[in-house]
């Protein structure tokens, strides 16, 4: 059955407008984004099939380009639109955090950094810069590629800390493999950055590693001391 033949209150767009976006299921949200179905499948049926194929909404959103565009009903244009929407969400989150100083607990910090890093297909290294009261000043991704001691330049972290007039910071990087356990390079690199930043009186409060599941705190796990 075509969506146009459904009762108005059950059509995803109308339902969104009448009841709010929170009333929509994952399939209905995806249907609103897709806009139209394909031959033989209305847009909600298409959305449900895609969620089953990818294993859920999160897996669909994190799918690589080749897997995404290869599916019937998707393609490069929709992939580009989706990436733009995701980036809008991340930037809005970053701006809201910096404006409202909303990182009030270690768990809030981990959730924020996971939102900023988990979509990255390769390793990235970033810093959450904080003031003297540990309120967020800015978040930046500073390095991309294989993250080890050779690829991280302490002087760049120092330079960005001075630029933001930061009193402290939280280091972070992702493990695209999904395993958030730190490597020896992760530990040595963190200690080297702590030493370098101590010279300008900037404290490293933690190093968060984002993989699958809950992000890992190197301080809470005893790998480093704040």
From Swiss-Prot:
Residue ranges of the motif JAMM motif: 173-186
UniProt-recorded Gene Ontology molecular function terms: metal ion binding; metallopeptidase activity
TM region(s), chain numbering: none
Single GO biological process annotation from the record: proteolysis
UniProt binding sites for Zn(2+): 173, 175, 186
Keywords: Hydrolase, Metal-binding, Metalloprotease, Protease, Zinc
Domain (MPN): residue spans on this chain: 102-224
Pfam families: RadC, UPF0758_N
Similarity comment: Belongs to the UPF0758 family.
Protein name: UPF0758 protein PputW619_0186
